[in-house]
């Protein structure tokens, strides 16, 4: 990936050759949300004499981090990474997005609530990860920040793994993590200092574990790629739930195969990490698996990433609408990420996530 200075120069001079693949631009139709304009906005914001306003800084928040523009770029520039880290420039200039005000405090509170929710449940409190075991990290969706928190997903994780363990005694010992969050929101907001501190604390808490298993696609990418980029390498190996389960797929105690489904491939798993394990697992538990079109590098982002649902909820919904309309789904949609599934459902397009179906298919 070219460095920031080179990337900004090349992008500002580019005749918008990647605009046609940017899902944010496609859904909005706004010239100010082409990758070229967003990178030019960041270039202007970084000038020593710059006196930017919140309105002028807004374009750099119009990115979900999906990476579609990079696949179309001859220079393999990473506008997503530069724009996300460039949001720190906006924060330092006091022109950060108002929707992200007090984000570190809110994330810390949410992580605490998620941890407490697990510890309050006697069943889950007795299943915490011990040194040497596989650590299970439930997602930290906003809908789970109060009340039950991540309890429902944590119970689903344990249910699937417990059922598998009855047939594969060689499955490693596992337990729940109570860290609450991997800190994706801090990274996506461009709060580098807060994110680095949070990441270092997270890394310390999981240092005694050999493996981390995540359900969220963005957190998987964050832990595998972004942590090391920020100088915080993790000791444990990071696996998405589907990666962890795939070697044991033939032993999954499938009681009944589920009807045909349409698979939604999350950007951070498919385009970023080239992980197709969720689809392969669905093939084990479903009669037929179709794909939400287009597929591969041409797939459309649903709008769940980059904090776009917080900074521009209307645009995030438009992206979900386009992804589903273009996808031509003829059966229920299943996402490889609970965050994507939640966003699609909230946008009026019911979608389930992989874990839901794993529980259903293995229920006697």
Regions found by a protein language model. Give the residues of each.
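Cys/His-coordinated zinc-binding microdomains
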Residues: 15, 26, 67, 74-77, ...
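Cysteine-centered loop/knuckle micro-motif
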Residues: 21-22, 72-73, 344
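Iron-sulfur-cluster electron-transfer modules
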Residues: 2, 39-214, 220, 226
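Cofactor-cradling patches in redox/metallo enzymes
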Residues: 76, 141-236, 268-364
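Cys/His-enriched microdomains
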Residues: 9-12, 16, 20, 61-71, ...
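C-terminal amphipathic alpha-helical segment
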Residues: 237-285
């Amino acid at each position: 990936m070219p460095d920031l200075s080179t990337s900004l120069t090349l992008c500002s001079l580019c005749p918008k050759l990647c605009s046609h693949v940017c899902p944010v631009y496609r859904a909005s139709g706004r010239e100010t949300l082409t990758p070229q304009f967003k990178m030019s906005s960041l270039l202007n914001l970084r000038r020593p004499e710059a006196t930017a306003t919140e309105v002028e800084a807004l374009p750099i928040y119009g990115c979900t981090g999906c990476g579609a523009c990079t696949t179309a770029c001859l220079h393999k520039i990473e506008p997503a990474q530069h724009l996300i880290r460039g949001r720190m420039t906006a924060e330092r200039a006091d022109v950060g997005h108002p929707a992200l005000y007090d984000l570190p405090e809110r994330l810390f509170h949410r992580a605490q609530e998620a941890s407490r929710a697990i510890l309050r449940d006697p069943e889950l409190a007795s299943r915490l990860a011990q040194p040497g075991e596989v650590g299970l990290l439930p997602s930290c969706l906003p809908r789970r920040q109060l009340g039950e928190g991540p309890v429902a997903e944590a119970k689903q994780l344990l249910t699937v793994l417990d059922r598998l363990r009855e047939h594969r005694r060689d499955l490693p010992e596992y337990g729940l993590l109570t860290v609450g969050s991997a800190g994706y929101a801090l990274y996506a907001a461009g709060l580098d200092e807060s994110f680095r501190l949070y990441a270092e604390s997270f890394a310390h808490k999981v240092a005694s574990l050999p493996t981390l298993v995540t359900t969220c696609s963005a957190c998987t990418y964050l832990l595998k790629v972004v942590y090391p980029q920020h100088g915080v390498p993790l000791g444990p190996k990071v696996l998405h739930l589907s990666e962890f389960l795939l070697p044991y797929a033939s032993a999954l105690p499938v009681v009944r195969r589920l009807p045909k489904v349409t698979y939604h491939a999350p950007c951070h798993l498919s385009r970023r990490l080239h992980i197709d394990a969720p689809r392969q697992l669905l093939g084990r538990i479903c009669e037929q698996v179709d794909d939400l079109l287009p597929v591969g590098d041409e797939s459309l982002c649903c709008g769940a990433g980059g904090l776009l649902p917080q900074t521009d909820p209307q645009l995030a919904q438009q992206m979900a609408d386009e992804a589903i309309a273009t996808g031509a789904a003829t059966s229920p949609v299943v996402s490889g990420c609970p965050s994507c599934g939640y966003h699609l459902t909230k946008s009026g397009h019911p979608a389930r996530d992989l874990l839901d179906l794993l529980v259903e298919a293995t229920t006697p």
